[in-house]
A protein has these predicted regions:
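Active-site anion-handling motifs in enzyme catalytic cores
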Residues: 1-410
Length: 410
């Protein structure tokens, strides 16, 4: 019996954390659900189609405008006008996909949270069509809350109880959900912790990167910046680019090698939404041609990125899923974060003191945290090693919950 799972909020292109979540869900659910096929409602349909190597994954365009206006309107019409349903299924790929789905997985990384009200309409639009078609909605491990803001609290109280299951990504999110009175929650860990390496990453990277850079003796310090953090730091009067450039130069002057790698990329596109390539190119230009410096000016897959990050000695990042990759590969990490979603993941490893926010950003702070990581290397590696198996198990457990809901639909 074929089971059909629709997915929204993730992608193969752009943010490689979203790619890791998508690929992890396909891998884990394909082994738990018989004859599983998947439909991705894509914000970047052309780019995702170009990268789609999955025979059982269909890509359907769902750009913000199309999702918010067309798909939501048709889904509402489907609900209130039963006589039009055959026509709607025949005329709209999106409605046909939803109507045949056993569940919709919402893989947004952080939704329904105070301070991000400009994304609230998209958060609602992502799940409302499925709710109107009475398709079970499962919010894969993600951060939600806090709910102190009037608009966000209202929307959360209206829509989140209608979701079949919310997988909370950490203790802070779970406490926020409890405080809102939600009872449809289960504890989990980010789906990207379930991503497994295929084993061919080195071979696939060799034509793209000189891997002798990470093979040679000595320390390699990795840097994965974020345009989101750049806006937050610069908005406070800081200088994110210059701060990281100076940190990289200081790393090189200390005799270490420095690897600059974008974890969110849209090749051939200069827009910076979910695209750190332009930022990384600016940083690389400022650093210049220096011995021991390597900039990865490529769009790598989530598995290639994880392999490469795993070859570093220490890692500095402002990208959430770059942090997931470094922790998954047991690499001591400095996190420059902007919300509770970073803290609650580091809490799983007892490493919440290894992060700081935009207000504290400076070259001196980055270098001080790197020095502290170097000093505490054995202790930090032991903390990651002792907690990683349980975190991965918690991540994979959401696949069991999803499979139960999907198979129950038949």
């Amino acid at each position: 019996m074929t089971h059909h799972i629709a997915i929204i909020g993730s992608a193969l292109s752009g943010n490689k954390g979203a790619s890791a979540m998508l690929e992890s869900s396909i891998a884990t659910l394909s082994t738990r659900v018989s004859d599983a096929r998947f439909t991705l409602f894509s914000m970047y349909p052309s780019e995702d189609a170009r990268l789609n190597d999955y025979a059982n994954l269909e890509i359907i365009p769902a750009t913000p405008g199309k999702l918010g206006v067309v798909i939501n309107s048709l889904a509402l019409l489907y609900r209130i006008a039963p006589f039009l349903r055959p026509t709607l299924r025949r005329r709209s790929r999106a409605i046909a996909a939803l109507a045949s789905a056993d569940a919709l997985l919402d893989q947004g990384g952080i939704t329904f949270t105070d301070g991000r009200e400009k994304f609230l309409l998209y958060n609602v639009a992502s799940i409302l069509p499925a709710l109107n078609l009475h398709v079970p909605v499962i919010k894969c491990a993600q951060a939600i809350g806090p709910f102190e803001g009037r608009i966000n609290r209202w929307a959360s109280q209206v829509f989140l109880p209608k979701v079949t299951l919310i997988v909370t990504r950490g203790a802070i999110t779970h406490d926020f959900a409890d405080g809102l009175g939600l009872t449809n929650t289960v504890r989990g860990a980010d789906y990207a912790f379930s991503l497994e390496l295929a084993g061919d990453e080195r071979e696939s990277l060799e034509p793209l990167i000189d891997l002798s850079f990470v093979d040679a003796p000595g320390d390699v310090v990795g840097f994965a910046p974020s345009v989101v953090m750049q806006k937050k730091v610069d908005g406070r009067g800081g200088q994110y680019v210059h701060g990281l450039v100076d940190a990289i130069v200081a790393t090189l002057d200390a005799g270490h090698r420095a690897l600059l790698v974008p974890h969110s990329t849209r090749a051939g596109i200069e827009k910076t939404h979910n695209n750190d390539l332009p930022l990384c190119r600016e940083i690389a230009r400022e650093v210049g041609e220096r011995a021991g410096f390597l900039f990865v000016d490529e769009e790598l897959s989530s598995q290639q990125l994880r392999y490469l990050i795993g070859r570093t000695t220490r890692f500095v990042t402002s990208r959430f899923h770059a942090m997931i990759s470094s922790l998954s590969m047991a690499v001591p990490t400095v996190v420059i974060g902007w919300s509770h979603k970073y803290q609650e993941v580091l809490d799983l490893f007892g490493l919440n003191d290894r992060a700081f926010g935009a207000a504290e950003f400076s070259t001196e702070r980055v270098l001080a945290e790197l020095a502290r990581l170097e000093r505490d290397d054995a202790e930090v590696r032991a903390a990651i090693a002792s907690n990683l198996p349980a975190v991965k198990e918690l991540s994979v457990s959401q696949a069991d919950h999803i499979a139960e809901i999907v198979t129950r639909a038949h």
